[in-house]
Amino acid sequence: MKKILGIVALFALIVLSCFYFFTKQPKNIFDEIYQETEKTYRTNNILRHIDGFEISPGWPSDDPNNLYTPFGLYNKEKTPSDYSEIEIGFNFRSSQKVLFIYSERSLSSNVSVKIWGSYNYKFGVLSKEATIIKKENNSKVYIDDQSEVKSYLEQYGVTAKDLDAYYDEIVNQKVLKDWCSIYDSKYSPSNYGEVKVETQWENW
């Protein structure tokens, strides 16, 4: 009887181990970036290997306010001239688990559009969103109300097709290509893998 129970327990352990291994396997390119950075951001952040990408100088940090939120920026030489910055950041808190990639593109001397690619690791969802940034009195005002964002973009002649092009230029052709250059990815900028994509401007 004990032998049978031992065999059953061993079998259950094997099944659980296989299940755990399977569920932890990256199902898409954003899973890869999230998992590999989570493993390394406290020691030798894997993203340091991207040419021209600079981890925020305060990392790694033991400050409880930003312990789980590492980020970095591309330097000016590696940032296309139409953009003021490109950032890759994370929130590794168990309640969040988010990877975000954003770029800021100028529309005028005091107005720019921020294109977000936010990946929710827990749910496997990539959200593509746009925010307007206005410079007022040496400070920045962020506008994320969808109708206001759309109105501003229309004023500057920016269409949904343009937003797709901005997203593709930075996320696909820049960040994800760079990722594939430093990591033996199963995926690519044209093949994300298993991920649900939600686009804010899809029906604009």
Feature annotation, model-predicted:
Residues 16-109:
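N-terminal export/targeting and maturation segments
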Residues 75-204:
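Extracytoplasmic electrostatic interaction patches
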